[in-house]
């Protein structure tokens, strides 16, 4: 799993999921660093590249390196006509639409949803995730739109909390497990300049 910034954070979350739902060992890399490592490429591996725009230069360069080694590649992108998508053997589109602000919140959630479904399916197909648990986790996803609606009803409370955080002298983002990369992304959004 290879990406930069927000996309890399979604790679980190996906590592937790794939290792939970399968017996696979998963590696993640920041795209800019991937090219400078002494990589031991394995033709049996799938190299997944995550990029909101599909044009991230470091991610494209890492993909290009894998293509030169005749490795299997897949991309998770928002723009299906992008360079990264065209160069990949398969594409998992996130269909999040264009980002309006500096923070890539829609794309991050879209990447995570697609990669969660991907992780579940890989676990099910490999037989590492039993069918009963697979169906339950898929069923839980169907509740997501309702949970989002309920959360959005709390807009006034959320605005008060946001104001308190904004006026505070400092903040800490504390998480463990698969929530750790979410904290990294939260910190990234929190410290991003407003448009």
Residue map of PLM features:
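Glycine-rich phosphate-binding loops that contact phosphosugars or nucleotide phosphates
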Residues: 1-143, 176, 188-193
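A short, well-structured juxtamembrane/interface segment
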Residues: 151-167
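Acidic catalytic cores of enzymes that act on phosphate-bearing nucleotides/polynucleotides
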Residues: 166-187
């Amino acid at each position: 799993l290879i990406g930069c910034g927000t996309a890399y954070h979604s790679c980190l979350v996906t590592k937790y999921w794939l290792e939970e739902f399968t017996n696979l060992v998963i590696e993640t890399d920041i795209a800019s660093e991937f090219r400078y490592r002494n990589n031991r490429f394995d033709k049996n591996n799938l190299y997944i590249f995550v990029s909101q725009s599909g044009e991230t230069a470091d991610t494209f360069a890492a993909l290009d390196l894998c293509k030169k080694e005749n490795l299997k590649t897949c991309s998770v992108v928002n723009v299906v006509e992008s360079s990264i998508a065209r160069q990949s053997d398969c594409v998992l589109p996130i269909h999040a639409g264009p980002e309006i602000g500096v923070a890539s919140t829609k794309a991050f959630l879209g990447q995570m949803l697609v990669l969660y479904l991907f992780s579940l399916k890989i676990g099910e197909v490999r037989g590492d995730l039993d069918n009963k648990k697979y169906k339950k986790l898929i069923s839980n996803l169907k509740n997501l739109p309702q949970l989002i609606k309920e959360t959005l009803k709390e807009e006034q409370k959320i605005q008060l909390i946001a104001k308190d955080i904004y006026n505070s002298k400092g903040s800490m983002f504390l998480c463990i497990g698969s929530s750790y990369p979410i904290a990294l992304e939260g910190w990234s959004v929190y410290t991003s300049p407003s448009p």
